């Protein structure tokens, strides 16, 4: 039982660390991903994506 609790705690800690590292990578990149909003003043859409006019979201570019 103690082993299971430790396994769960370490698993959650690893998941938290991985998600934090992924978030840092995304914020450093500085571009909006697929279906993210692309309002003026925000970073531009990522490569291969284009900002649509009426909905202001990043979709597959032309």
UniProtKB/Swiss-Prot annotation:
<dbReference type="GO" id="GO:0090729">
    <property type="term" value="F:toxin activity"/>
</dbReference>
<dbReference type="GO" id="GO:0008200">
    <property type="term" value="F:ion channel inhibitor activity"/>
</dbReference>
<feature type="disulfide bond">
    <location>
        <begin position="45"/>
        <end position="58"/>
    </location>
</feature>
<dbReference type="GO" id="GO:0005576">
    <property type="term" value="C:extracellular region"/>
</dbReference>
<keyword id="KW-0732">Signal</keyword>
<keyword id="KW-0964">Secreted</keyword>
<keyword id="KW-1015">Disulfide bond</keyword>
<comment type="similarity">
    <text>Belongs to the neurotoxin 10 (Hwtx-1) family. 30 (Jztx-14) subfamily.</text>
</comment>
<feature type="disulfide bond">
    <location>
        <begin position="31"/>
        <end position="46"/>
    </location>
</feature>
<keyword id="KW-0872">Ion channel impairing toxin</keyword>
<feature type="disulfide bond">
    <location>
        <begin position="38"/>
        <end position="51"/>
    </location>
</feature>
<keyword id="KW-0800">Toxin</keyword>
<protein>
    <recommendedName>
        <fullName>U8-theraphotoxin-Cg1a 1</fullName>
    </recommendedName>
</protein>
<keyword id="KW-0960">Knottin</keyword>
<feature type="signal peptide">
    <location>
        <begin position="1"/>
        <end position="21"/>
    </location>
</feature>
<dbReference type="Pfam" id="PF07740">
    <property type="entry name" value="Toxin_12"/>
</dbReference>
<dbReference type="InterPro" id="IPR011696">
    <property type="entry name" value="Huwentoxin-1"/>
</dbReference>
<feature type="propeptide">
    <location>
        <begin position="22"/>
        <end position="29"/>
    </location>
</feature>
<comment type="function">
    <text>Probable ion channel inhibitor.</text>
</comment>
């Amino acid at each position: 039982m103690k082993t299971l609790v430790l396994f769960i705690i370490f698993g959650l800690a690893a998941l938290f660390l991985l998600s934090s590292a992924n978030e840092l990578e995304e914020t450093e990149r500085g571009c909006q991903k697929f279906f993210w909003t692309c309002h003026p003043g925000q970073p531009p859409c990522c490569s291969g994506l284009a900002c649509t006019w009426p909905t202001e979201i990043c979709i597959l570019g032309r």
